[in-house]
A protein has these predicted regions:
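N-terminal amphipathic/basic leader segments beginning at the initiator methionine
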Residues: 1-23
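Gly/Ser/Thr-rich loops at beta-strand to alpha-helix junctions
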Residues: 13-14, 39-41, 83-91, 171-177, ...
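A glycine- and small-aliphatic-rich helix-loop capping segment at beta-alpha/alpha-beta transitions
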Residues: 51-56, 87, 93-102, 125-130, ...
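Catalytic or ion-translocation cores adjacent to nucleophile or general acid/base/metal-coordination motifs
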Residues: 100-116, 179-220, 224
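Active-site cavity-forming subdomains of large catalytic enzyme subunits
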Residues: 102, 106-113, 117, 121-169
Length: 435
């Protein structure tokens, strides 16, 4: 019988189903429980939490750990997660408290060092420009609040090699929480590229949780039930081949279609880059091998790129939005009149960095109900100076309620204060400078 490592995923984002962790360990045999919580947006959420509550990690993960800790330790199920976010040490300390409260002896490990904010000036002086992948801008003029390198799998493998029962990760690649345990189980070397590429494919497929089990699937009518959609398990073999399945009795579907859809998720070219290996997705084979069982084999890998990706977040301008509902005839003309009046009331468009105007035509001709009778005029004001926004701006818009076009009604928006935006800044760093 082929030896496999059963890696289960219980989370695809911060806010995913809380009881999925317990469901995965109670529903059948698994060897490793993983969870991915760190979308790029999540980093900004954790930054704000760290500023206000001194946390910076995914607090709901602690509830999941408490629910599964005894079972996992008793059955030697490892836990690997990136829920450490911006504070993996703090998360590890909280996990240790949970084990102590439960009277459990377990080894808790955490990975650190992804935060390069303290080193940014030295790195830039050494030639790192951190050029924005999307815009080509240089980071030098930006106001940086977070900067985290996407680590690979080898720190996770080392922690497991040293007997860790749970590994708390910071900003690692989504697939690293799967590659690391597989490399540990089968003792892969850094140049076992085909095996690593297979594990990368497995990690990429199960990283989004229930999404590869029928969630967000375009051909949704193929899915037997969307009640209690199951979460995925990757049964990984020594050569990197794997079979994706889910626990019996759960909803959803594991098919060639659902796995192919997830494989193509966030992919630009068939060469999928990771700090540990490049997986060539045009080499692999996908086949249905049973009910809710799909095997992926033959993935070829090559040496990793010379750079690591970095997730930077910078302080952007301030924004404030409002919406007004327009009804009746001549919607475009009404929108034009309303916009002219509001810009006049507040002293002109030129004082803002930008004014974004969208006319959303959700209205129907000769509507049967009020809900389909209106269009929405959405106005977003952008300013580097926060004094340009706030209560006065909102008041000037409110004043038009009885003094402008017929059939208009406000629908709120950004409230009475313009909020500062945190802007995602994707870039690279020379891998030789990653510690």
């Amino acid at each position: 019988m082929v030896e496999v490592l059963r890696v289960a995923n219980c989370s695809g984002f911060y806010g995913d189903r809380l009881d999925a962790a317990k469901e995965m360990i109670d529903g059948g045999p698994v060897d490793v429980l993983t969870g991915d919580y760190l979308a790029e947006l999540t980093t900004t959420i954790l930054y704000n939490q760290r500023q206000s509550r001194n946390t910076g990690y995914v607090g709901t993960f602690l509830k999941q750990v408490k629910a599964v800790a005894e079972h996992c330790v008793a059955n030697n199920i490892k836990i690997v997660s990136n829920a450490g976010g911006l504070n993996p040490k703090g998360m590890a300390e909280e996990v240790e408290k949970i084990y102590e409260e439960l009277g459990i002896t377990a080894k808790v490990a955490y990975i650190d060092g992804d935060d390069i904010v303290p080193d940014l000036k030295d790195l830039q002086a050494g030639g790192e420009t951190f050029t924005n992948i999307d815009t080509g801008e240089d980071l030098a003029a930006a106001d940086v609040v977070t900067a985290n390198t996407y680590f690979g799998a080898w720190g996770i493998k080392e922690a497991l090699d040293n007997g860790a029962d749970i590994v708390i990760c910071p900003r690692v690649t989504d697939a690293a929480v799967v590659i690391g345990p597989a490399a540990w189980k089968f003792n892969w070397a850094r140049d076992d590229y085909d095996a690593l590429a297979g594990a990368l494919a497995a990690g990429h497929i199960i990283e989004c949780g229930a999404q590869c089990c029928g969630g967000n699937y375009a051909f949704f009518e193929e899915v037997p039930s969307y009640r209690d959609v199951g979460y995925p398990i990757a049964e990984i073999e020594a050569d990197g081949s794997f079979t994706v399945t889910k626990h019996p009795g759960t909803g959803g579907l594991v098919s060639v279609g659902t796995i192919s859809a997830q494989l193509l998720y966030e992919i630009s070219t068939p060469a999928y880059y990771n700090p540990d290996v490049v997986a060539h997705f045009d080499t692999l084979k996908i086949e249905q091998v049973g009910d809710d069982r799909v095997r992926v084999s033959g993935t070829r890998g090559s040496n990793p790129p010379p750079t690591h990706k970095v997730c930077v977040n910078t302080r952007g301008p301030y924004k404030q939005s409002t919406e007004v509902l327009l009804t009746g005839l001549d919607i475009e003309k009404k929108a034009e009149i309303y916009l002219d009046a509001i810009l006049h009331n507040i002293g002109g468009r030129e004082q803002f960095d930008d004014v974004d105007v969208q006319l959303i035509r959700s209205d129907h001709e000769d509507p049967d109900t009020n809900e389909v009778s209106h269009a929405a005029l959405r106005i977003t004001f952008v300013a580097s100076d926060p004094s340009k926004l706030g209560r006065l701006l909102q008041a000037k818009m409110t004043e038009l309620g009885l003094a402008n076009i017929p059939g208009n009604t406000g629908r709120g928006g950004g409230g009475y204060s313009g909020n500062q935006v945190l802007v995602h800044w994707p870039c690279f760093i020379d891998s030789k400078k990653v510690v």
